[in-house]
Amino acid sequence: MDHMSPRLRAFLSEPIGEKDVAWVDGISHELAINLVTKGFNKAYVLLGQFLLMHKREAEFQKWLICCCGATEFEARECSNCLKEWCSCFL
């Protein structure tokens, strides 16, 4: 990846552990509230959804947009963050 935001770099620097979902790159405050309301309060829970979708970025992005109210930018950044985390830790 050519350019990593500081937030993405920080997220990729260590295992997910008990990080709140708001730590995931691309997750705005408003989107975090929507996700928590739907039961996705931790980054590992959101990662689980990504893995259930077999790491298919387009499918995951569509789900974030349609079901959670993400913008296209947020969905793209979030799926990229989780994909990069999987590359580093799985």
UniProtKB/Swiss-Prot annotation:
Pfam family, one: SAM_BAF
Gene Ontology biological process terms, A to Z: chromosome organization
Role played: May play a role in BANF1 regulation and influence tissue-specific roles of BANF1.
Subunit structure: Homodimer. Heterodimerizes with BANF1.
MF terms in GO: DNA binding
Location within or outside the cell: Nucleus; Cytoplasm
Chain coiled-coil ranges: none
Designated name of the protein: Barrier-to-autointegration factor-like protein
UniProt xrefs under SMART domains: BAF
GO cellular component, one term: cytoplasm
